Amino acid sequence: MPGPTSRSDSPAASSQSAVLSDSEFHARANEVLSAIEATLVSWLQEDEIDIDSQRTGGLLELQFPSGSKIVVNTQPPLHELWLAARTGGYHFRLVGGEWIDTRGGGEFFAMLSREISAQAGRPLVIARSAA
């Protein structure tokens, strides 16, 4: 029986990220972080939920009213986005214009929305773009 598949050998990991320049990666990753922040601001303005956020460079930390946290972090050397939540850590690479989990194949915004909903205790969906 073959051994475990490494991140770089998994089908989900073979992605368009290999052809991205560092500046393209930074631009695409920044779009993701900005979209998350824009959604949080919208929720606050609409009295939907107050999730505090703090962004430092490529790291965005979300803190929920319960005190729990979700962290989204860019990993420039790997051209990946990392998501840390109660359920674990996930690594995403850009594949066909979408950020896809390198292990399970899930899409970033769907997984982030699921994690936010679980930690907020109600359904919430993160918008894909800040526009």
Listing of model-derived features with the role each one plays in the protein:
Residues 2-131:
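N-terminal intrinsically disordered, cationic/polar leader segments
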